[in-house]
Amino acid sequence: MPSGGRGRPRLQVGERSLLERPSPPKRRLIPRAQLLPQLLLALTVASVFYTIWRIWHSQTEELPLGRELRGPLIGSLPEARVRRVVGQLDPHRLWNTFLRPLLVVRTPGSPGNLQVRKFLEATLRTLSAGWHIELDSFTASTPVGPLDFSNVVATLDPGAARHLTLACHYDSKLFPSDSAPFVGATDSAVPCSLLLELAQALDQELGKAKERAAPMTLQLIFLDGEEALKQWGPKDSLYGSRHLAQLMESTPHGLGSTRIQAIELFMLLDLLGAPNPTFYSHFPRTARWFHRLRSIEKRLHRLNLLQSHPWEVMYFQTGEPPGSVEDDHIPFLRRGVPVLHLIATPFPSVWHTSDDSEANLHPPTVHNLSRILAVFLAEYLGL
């Protein structure tokens, strides 16, 4: 996931053509007695139109452009509900049950990769909400020879019209055999454990949403082969996301739609777990949802529901990101999917080193992120 600036196209204003000199307007003298009623009538009509315009504008100004116009108009949870959602999260379970089994070398095609993939599947199958779990398995040519990859796709209700999709990659980067073991704690064991904890903590609410056939459902995607095997490039990276996006684009979903068109919002989690992360909105289309996360962070801080979180370490920042990032969202973004990229930028100092381990994680940050995301999911899905 190399970072670097990428030019953004700017809208260019065309030259205005010269206008011919207009002919002098015809005038007529209006007696003063007739002028006042006409002015009052004009002001009344203008006031009515202005009121109508303001009502319409207030209802639409917060809506982004494009496919996301059909997104839900969500409201904030009452304080009691916020506290209940946060209370359903279990920091011990997140860390010991979900995270630690992922902290192994898990390069594509390795025994560790298979072990982690089976762990993800088994964990999702234990949830009472009843997830529909699919494997997208394929073989791809790589710089180190043909390799087998498998994406894990868990959809709460496959029949729902729209999907809120949370994604992360579960493979770890390949290093020379004489290198120290690389377990990729932030990259991306922590994101995977966050997804599992969210599904477990909200299990009952998600099950009820499925029973009532809510039009919006939750989808979790665990991608294989994000990391380059030799050198990052368009053919040596994003193996799993490239394959899955193409597959979803060609798979029908409902009448006249495809599975990729069913994704209303694609949230990609990456490089999470180091202390004091900063996140930025990378795409105007999803800025609305980024600012919702920022608002939730502020609210949880005010309610004293975040740990080791003074105001000066706010995670969700305003302003431009330090640079663009190539990651698993790219194949989906290119197909028109709205993307919210939750990645720490600048990258953690341990990025792509053997120090990206459990010892260098910051537990309060991990648990704070789980709380922010849990409230976001509860609000977005109406749980």
From Swiss-Prot:
Transmembrane parts of this sequence: 35-57
Active site per the UniProt annotation: 226 (proton acceptor), 270 (proton acceptor)
Entry EC no(s): 2.3.2.5
Entry binding sites for Zn(2+): 187, 227, 352
Biological process terms in GO annotation: peptidyl-pyroglutamic acid biosynthetic process, using glutaminyl-peptide cyclotransferase
Chain residue ranges for the region called Disordered: 1-25
GO cellular component assignments: Golgi membrane
Function: Responsible for the biosynthesis of pyroglutamyl peptides.
Protein name per the record: Glutaminyl-peptide cyclotransferase-like protein
Species annotation: Bos taurus
